[in-house]
Amino acid sequence: KDPLQAERALAEGHCDLVGIVRGQIADADFAAKARAGATDETRLCLSCNQECVGRMGLNRWLGCIENPRTGREAEGVGAIRITPKPKSVMVVGAGPGGLQAAIASRRNGHAVTVFEKESQAGGQVRIAASVPNRAEFGDMVRNQLAECRRLGVKFEYDVGVWPGLVEECRPDHVIIATGAEPAQP
């Protein structure tokens, strides 16, 4: 699942070789990052089996909920296009959608600030990660936050967004990523 786990298995003599597939689906640079010792930057597989194993036999392209480019590399999905005219971008919501919007905007050269009404990022994924045996869903947010930090995305926690704040901040663009409310059983 992660480079440290693979190294540990080798060091303890449990195996002579480690094959990692889903880890490289989640992060195409998995091996290069492991070799460079950049394990904190590695996007870890969530073990969800949704878009990789879950698509087997369905005659659909390979995908990964952690990596929107997986299976679409040739289409240019997620390709970085640095803008010659950077804009200020306000992202409202720090769930997975908001974090991914922030990452994409920042990679393309824009100045990004994420506003989150809660004291921490994650949105509904925090609920999914609390289900027994599904804690790895929290890795998605951890991975996205690590990428946001690396890129220099700014965060404002415990700040709800209202029209007055948008007028005060005067961003060039606003991305609303406030997610959904959990369904009542």
Q: For each predicted feature, which ranges?
A:
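Glycine-/small-residue-rich beta->alpha transition segments that form the dinucleotide
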Residues: 171-173, 177-184
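Flavin-dependent oxidoreductase catalytic cores
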Residues: 1-92, 96-107, 111-112, 120, ...
